[in-house]
């Protein structure tokens, strides 16, 4: 951008538009040039005449006339004297508006420091002079001396330590030095003058070069830091052309009087702005000081007065920053200039970002069920007031009134003409409705008003969800758009019918709820054997007539024609079909319409019919719902609540089970933890059983027409969980600490709770209310931070032409799917071709925009990962390109240029914040430690491959897992087989991997894409997804037999230790087939093939009942065009059910296993972690001493005693079991507290014997930060307290010598790199000696820090981690948010880089610089032939990112206002006004939407 020239602003010439705003320090000359005169007296106005005093704070001579065009003494009045200066009172005759512009000044007798540059860290004056802030304050407040020149002075008699310039001395030192060296050039002074002189005398360039040398030479970390700090400040002065001496004030500007008004109240009192009081103190002290100096008063008195002057100026700028705040008459601190601009009540947030506007009103809302989608009811009274100017114009226009006065009179009388004109104005004129809190863009929508009587606004029921409004007393505000542009915008973009989709997820939000759902659900239910069953109806009119004549029940099953075939439906569903558009298929409406089903229909209509169709359809749906909900007359009765008959018995049985567990515990068979876990299990199980019995009862009651069941089942109100509390048992409750109380509430609400039960349940209820209050505030703050950090993200171009993308896959958390790949692909652009794994054809090329259909195609093709373009990898400057962002979810189209995607992202993440829990709710105790945590079961077909898996064979002949990590059991199917025996060679060329098989006579090569092959860290469970990727069972150079598979597709995998714990028993052998029931899944004909090489060879003549012995048998289903529709792998040992060439439909069984048992891959003890012997040998105990570190436990079953490590082991003991193997090697096993030991001292053990067992930790209801705190933790990039250490390289672990009680972990890579890590006491290592770890894998317990992840694994890994973590929180609460919103925020967190080497640039090492500035500076330096700077990506939390925004105005209005402005003034920063916030503040058009074309000429062509 070319250098812009500052605009000279004068009183009569104000700029219409500005390009930039610069902040600078004001020189004394500048202050004088602003000033219109010196304020000499502290007086304000004369109490008798109420006229301003001359030379006082409100002086008319300095600041301008009090009355428009009238001088103070009244000699000159009226416009004709404009510009005349009255010779009597000295006032210029002009508009009184100048009192808002004209400034005055105060000549200070002595220079005074500006408190911002002293006390706001880092203290600028202190840093420049190189003295501590405390010392600087002592000098300024006349408590200490600062050395101006040391001369030949020394502190000690031996002349060893010289007195240096800038040393700070106390009174005593000063006296001594003056008496000894006063003649020899020693000079020291105190106060503002000396500081100003010192600042004036600094040669910045000299100092800069000298410090640059120092920083190169110094070795110490701390010194480097302090020098870098100084360099930064010096550099900012050098670049800005500011003079450091200007930080000391010699002339104080005085604010224009109308900005610090003095208002007279009734009763002769005055309301006065605090700033006036602060100015008066400054003037008083300054005048007194002047007199004292003239009188040549004693030094001590003058000094005191100077100190008081400094203090009063400090108070004026920032009261209370230093020492005690100056208090006013009413004992509260006075509001200084800093306080006026900062904080929620400050200028920025109160008056600039949120203004109150004209033409607005607010009132209560009531429901308007008769309105159509775009309408709202507006009370006539309000309309009359809001449209008053329009009305006056209209009345004059029509000739009903001749003058404004007459028109006003008519409006007051409310004559008929007025109503007629009002109706004409309002017709087609949109109004905006807004409901606070405005959490997202749907909280402000436009409607066409309908004039109504009464005093309440009527709101359409369907828009309530978007506004989050209900009718229990909510209020809404109305705003009138005035300009034609605003009206157009309201009509085109903001009408309610345009806002059917939620920008956060693209799902419809204006969908029926509550009564409407109930009505629609009710009419789509079916009943057997009612009037008119099985009749045939031609159309809906016949149905209506029949119902009206009572010949047909609305729930009767009837038949009708649809698409030329007869379908079975019900009378009610035909009524529903009548209001649907024609293109809706019957499977969408011919079913029981629950809330979800209705939403699906609305989504379908929106996608295929567009906005116009949808709006009309929604209105018809609303009317139908309300009508039938009314007619159904569904009500609640206590008898609808059905309590299961077997409840008493079931509870009695559970009590007995608990009693048994208690007895076992008392006998010492169970630990306290096991007892607790088991009891909780019993009750959870009881509660679930009762709940299912009760739900069955309610469902079957009245043949499905039980009112309570209908309400919950339809999704209108209530849930199964609530019915369970009404009719089952209330269940387990949690203590304040989050532990679950083991005595449950047995009663339900119908029976009533007893006193104890009631008391237990009150805690949860009260906590719920407290949480809600806290939550709202937290969620609001999170939204504000998000908006602030993302406000400048907009779409700047269509395509940035990057080829980079990020690999994505399903997000799941320990087998529960959180977000599917299909969902994640919808509305995104591919960054790489997607290849069909079956046919190897390109399904979708790079650059394709995927919609729901294509995303589904990809998912159904069995593809598990894909590369997509994301905002994070976008190369656009100052924004994002449309293709990296994808679809705008609110419209379903590719996003348009100028869309403010940052704000939309922030709102989408912030708005559901209130729904997130503050702490995770505690659903079950250990209800989950059931079968799933004892074993893993194969759910797909294929065969088993061990990856790195080693096993021990125990004495019972079991296979026990010997790996602690970096191993897995894979379930695969063959992809390529070796066509002949030979040697396998694998080589990587660019992004392709070539696998070849060579025999003596022949070589064959297969080419695969590199990113389709599972990487070692992915196989070990450290990286991304392995499902759907390829695995090479043979290493390069291995020999293979003919028809052995050399490339396999991974269908599932269980890695050690996260899916299969150490020391589990593996129940499947390497290479064993896993059979499943295989269904056709498509219509067509079955054909069987065998895999040969990488192609399929026809295998004919298979009959039903055949047991498969072939390897690599595939069944394909081909469609009528002989195209392969689907391919299934048939594992050995399956029984063929569908013979070759059989015709099948999707549900046909093709093959099945021999027996129906599922294949268990591995199983383990769910209640404890075993320690097993790794070799045979002899056991020896260390530090296991009965009574000190261990206790004896008697086992009733075996009759033996067993040692158990005590709960609290004294610090000096480390209980260890040492195993001496037969060849003399020693293996040490440290045992934790509560471990039971299964061997005796000196016993002999065999491989894989259990030595000891540690019980798994007590299952507290999850205490991991969940909900809101977790989200803000992720976005703030906080370093968690308990950070896990992560390995930076791939390598083998060993343990070195401990250092100061810290364990030393060494990771050594193949190429000889060693990395050392020290584990402190609070963490425990999770790796063992000899383990192989991958980069990014954790070495100790704790949470992985995002910063570490970024440093070691890079941006893409961090991206996947953050997106999945945030999604986990939101999805678990049932909130759908598209990934792209999280990505936009994440991109903003990465917009800065950290300088590692500064090269020849102006950066300083360790600086955080925005990527844009970094690139610009480097480009400039390279052009000049210098060395560019080197930087690394750096993750900044959203608060820091917002405060360090490139725009000063935006940063200042967010937080730390004084700090930001201080920094900006010193470095003379320029705000380019590129983003939303600063433009809102100064009142320009914002540069998004049509605002991006603001400066462009538009050409119209005629043809």
Curated annotation (Swiss-Prot):
Zn(2+) 1 binds at residues 71, 73, 86, 89. Binds 1 Mg(2+) ion per subunit. Binds 2 Zn(2+) ions per subunit. GO terms for cellular component: DNA-directed RNA polymerase complex. Its EC number is 2.7.7.6. Zn(2+) 2 binds at residues 800, 874, 881, 884. InterPro entries: DNA-dir_RpoC_beta_prime, DNA-dir_RpoC_beta_prime_bact, RNA_pol_asu, RNA_pol_N, RNA_pol_Rpb1_1, RNA_pol_Rpb1_3, RNA_pol_Rpb1_3_sf, RNA_pol_Rpb1_4. Keywords: DNA-directed RNA polymerase, Magnesium, Metal-binding, Nucleotidyltransferase, Transcription, Transferase, Zinc. It catalyses: RNA(n) + a ribonucleoside 5'-triphosphate = RNA(n+1) + diphosphate. Mg(2+) binds at residues 470, 472, 474. Belongs to the RNA polymerase beta' chain family. DNA-dependent RNA polymerase catalyzes the transcription of DNA into RNA using the four ribonucleoside triphosphates as substrates. NCBIfam families: rpoC_TIGR (TIGR02386). This is DNA-directed RNA polymerase subunit beta'. The gene is rpoC.
